[in-house]
Design a protein with these regions (language model features):
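Helix N-cap/beta-alpha junction loops of NAD(P)-dependent oxidoreductase domains
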Residues: 89-94, 142
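Short alpha-helical oligomerization interface
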Residues: 92-108
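NAD(P)H-dependent oxidoreductase Rossmann-fold/reductase module
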Residues: 1-80, 87-89, 148, 171-320
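A short, exposed helix-loop element centered on a Lys and neighboring polar residues
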Residues: 118-119, 195
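A short helix-coil junction within the Rossmann-fold of NAD(P)-dependent oxidoreductases
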Residues: 75-76, 93-94, 120-129
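Ankyrin-repeat alpha-helix packing hotspot
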Residues: 111-112
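Active-site loop of short-chain dehydrogenase/reductase
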Residues: 78, 125-162, 203-205
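Active-site beta-alpha turn of Rossmann-fold NAD(P)-dependent dehydrogenases/reductases
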Residues: 86, 134-137, 169
């Protein structure tokens, strides 16, 4: 077996992340899994391995994320791979939800919590001999992709909502909340965050990836909030997309792809984006892909990072 790698994973309590974590644990790697509460931590340990290290932090609370990072920094254990996989969406809900710091929940969890972790834990990554960052994004960040064409397209505009601080429902500053677009925008933020990180740390491999459409049969995981808003519609959507049209990828295959990116891919310094694209019903091809034009804009990436950093700092200062 190859030398055990030290891997920190968010979003390992269900779905793709949980499957990948189990694979990596079975291969003898040293995992630290971030779970949002004690119940999720216990369930994750039961499914993966009772000896796996789990730390609790709710990504909807930047103060908890900051405390988590402080704990890891105090330990001074290098991180070989930082896997930013956690994500949520609540399409179907008409009103925005808010984090503890008053930030729209999709942005807070999918983007800001992960940028905070990147900023705080970067010293531990740079202590490792062969570090890498892996970010789970989505093809829906791209308005020309299959999923990106459904509903309002991703687009950050001039970042007016982010610029105005906590309390804005949409990153682009639009007053009307659109939960589906908020998710797409958060995935666009993930790619831009990775692009800016790679620019600032040119020797660090930064890999963003899209797993394809994954719709499990279970009632928990990624689509749980959307099922609560529209249980019948989401059930029918799953049956049609997964079972009839065969447009989806399985949790197992997607988890294996994530494991490959973390452990097996010969990652080169700089930013790269991989997509698990549907080629025909039941068939996917996993390969390097060009992100959307907006996801490649260096000026937007730099400004997004700056404004996100400012919002994080302001939110944490207000907790004091």
């Amino acid at each position: 077996m190859a030398e055990a790698r030290r891997v920190l994973i968010t979003g390992a309590s269900s779905g793709i992340g949980r499957h990948a974590a189990r694979r990596m644990e079975q291969e003898g790697h040293r995992l630290t899994l971030i779970c949002r509460n004690h119940q999720r931590a216990a369930e994750t340990l039961d499914w993966i391995d009772p000896t796996t290290r789990v730390l609790e932090a709710d990504l909807a609370d930047l103060e908890q994320v900051d405390t988590l990072c402080a704990t890891l920094l105090q330990e001074q254990e290098p991180i070989d791979a930082l896997v930013l996989n956690a994500g949520l969406q609540y399409a179907g809900h008409r009103q925005p939800r808010w984090s503890r710091q008053g930030i729209e929940l999709t942005l807070a969890v999918n983007h800001l919590a992960h940028q905070l972790m990147l900023m705080r834990l970067l010293p531990l990554l740079l202590q490792a001999d062969e570090p890498r960052v892996v970010i789970t994004a989505s093809e829906v960040h791209n308005p020309t992709s299959g999923g990106g064409r459904v509903g309002s397209p991703a687009g950050l505009g001039d970042l007016a909502g982010l610029r105005s601080g906590a309390g804005s429902a949409m990153v682009d500053g639009k007053e009307r909340f659109d939960a589906d677009k908020a998710y797409k925008d958060s995935k666009l933020c993930n790619l831009l965050m990775g692009l800016e990180l790679a620019r600032n740390q040119p020797r660090l491999p930064v890999i963003a990836w899209s797993p394809g459409l994954v719709i499990p049969r279970s009632q928990d995981g990624f689509f749980r909030e959307s099922r609560r808003a529209n249980p019948l519609g989401q059930t029918l959507f799953g049956v049609v997309a997964r079972d009839l049209l065969r447009l989806t990828e399985s949790i197992e295959n997607a988890g294996d792809l994530l494991t490959r990116l973390v452990l097996q891919l010969n990652a080169q310094p700089g930013f790269q984006y991989w997509s698990n694209s549907l080629t025909r019903p039941g068939q996917h091809r996993f390969e390097p892909t060009a992100p959307s034009a907006e996801a490649c804009d260096p000026e937007t990436a730099t400004e997004l990072w700056r404004l996100s950093d400012h919002l994080i700092a302001t939110a944490l200062a207000d907790q004091c």
